């Protein structure tokens, strides 16, 4: 085995040095360099944590994607969603309340967005 990163748990979670480390603690979505270029005109692979993926928000974010819901897990105060767009898999959390209620169904298409400040470049 090889040690990928030595750091505090908080730094490993917030600033992983590789896709392996990003996926080791918590949930994340890894966007490959090819997909980053094709869909976002971005030149590096990156990870995005589900808590930073906004659902059906304004398209004024740095990254926007329309994807289909492929899995829904009710977890009490939130829904954990898995979304697909071609080869891209995105994990997102949806926190329902009376002002943002949307219909969640497998196969439904929804708009996703996130800001550059919330991604981690993986340089892989």
Residue ranges and their predicted role:
Residues 8, 20, 34, 66-70:
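Residues located in well-ordered beta-strands
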Residues 13-36, 45-47:
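C-terminal boundary and immediately downstream tail of ABC-type ATPase nucleotide-binding domains
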Residues 2, 11, 43:
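Short, flexible active-site loop motifs that bind/organize anionic cofactors or intermediates
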Residues 28, 37-124:
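Non-catalytic connector elements of ABC transporters
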Residues 8-11, 32, 49, 115:
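Short, solvent-exposed coil/turn linker segments
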Residues 3-8, 15:
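ABC ATPase "signature
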